[in-house]
Amino acid sequence: MAHHAAQGDYVACVVLTHGARVHDKVISDSMFHRERVPTGDELLEMMTQRSDVKAEEVRKACGILGFQDVYFFGEDDAVLLMTDDNVRRLAAMIRLRKPDIVLTHFPREGDAFSNPHAIAGQITMYAISYAASVDPADANPPHRVAQVFFFGTGAAATRHQLWDAEGGYYNDVFIDITDVIERKLAAMDCLVSQGYGGAYARKRIETSDGAFGQAGGVSYGEGFISLYAETHYLLPVTDYALKRARSSDHEIMAGYSYRIKAD
């Protein structure tokens, strides 16, 4: 996203849930070991406050990556389900903003039916499909998305549970983020309430972005799974592939050996 924002592309983010129940330092962490937790309006008020904190952290993180438009749908993350309402709402956003590319979670991540990432991906896929047609409640014309990329972290990560046995998915696109890795770290450091800053951010960047980078022949990368096959007039070969083909073993290793300074 930082690369696209830097070259002048319009970049925006949609956050489906308020996120107050998951990973939050106050709601899901400090209350975990209590004998009793607040209920009713008291808990709802706390969750509203915490979701506001999270939203501000997300805005700050996105600003570091170079874009400002962040849309919060505020869905309750207690039991995230695909509904007619959230599909129509997201489809309306797609018709309004007319994206060429959509990034989203893999619709079959984890068990694919209780995993909130998977449900978010399913909502997105239905919305993309519906956005290509008219809606009596939406004056914007239909819009067709050109390409969808699923986050590789969840869909093509290390298998470690029963549902991963389905597998078979692999990252077919790697994006070199070495030049903006410090900015990604700074963005993750903003997500304090989520527990993503500090030591976790540095570990995550090395183990995830570092692994994707090495697979792609660079120091740090992000992996994606593309939805549609690409059509070309000529057989494609990237500049990265040509450079690797003309590099010695040690030059290839040097290409992915840079390590961010951890403070």
Language-model segment annotations:
Residues 1-97:
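Active-site rim/loop-helix segments in enzyme catalytic domains that contact anionic ligands
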Residues 3, 76, 80-263:
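Metal-dependent de-N-acetylase/amidase catalytic core
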